[in-house]
């Protein structure tokens, strides 16, 4: 009986530890993934770049994107 209780407690502790680690590990965001309001955690080969959105001169929001490192993006007309 004691062995069953001990085994149950050990299994409970292991499952709790695994769940806690899974919550702490955030998956990285892939290329061109949009995250609003705050920079996200982009994958290691990417960089987070944020832009403000304006309407009639007032900022209405902010978007952050995961983009390739070292690549320059230009606006096309």
Curated annotation (Swiss-Prot):
One Gene Ontology MF term: toxin activity
GO cellular component: extracellular region
Location(s) in or outside the cell: Secreted
Superkingdom of origin: Eukaryota
Cross-referenced InterPro entries: Spider_toxin_CSTX_knottin
Pro-sequence residue ranges: 21-26
Changes after translation: Contains 4 disulfide bonds.
Coiled coil feature spans: none
Segment forming the signal sequence: 1-20
Family: Belongs to the neurotoxin 19 (CSTX) family. 08 (U8-Lctx) subfamily.
Name of the molecule in the record: U8-lycotoxin-Ls1l
Taxonomic classification: Eukaryota, Metazoa, Ecdysozoa, Arthropoda, Chelicerata
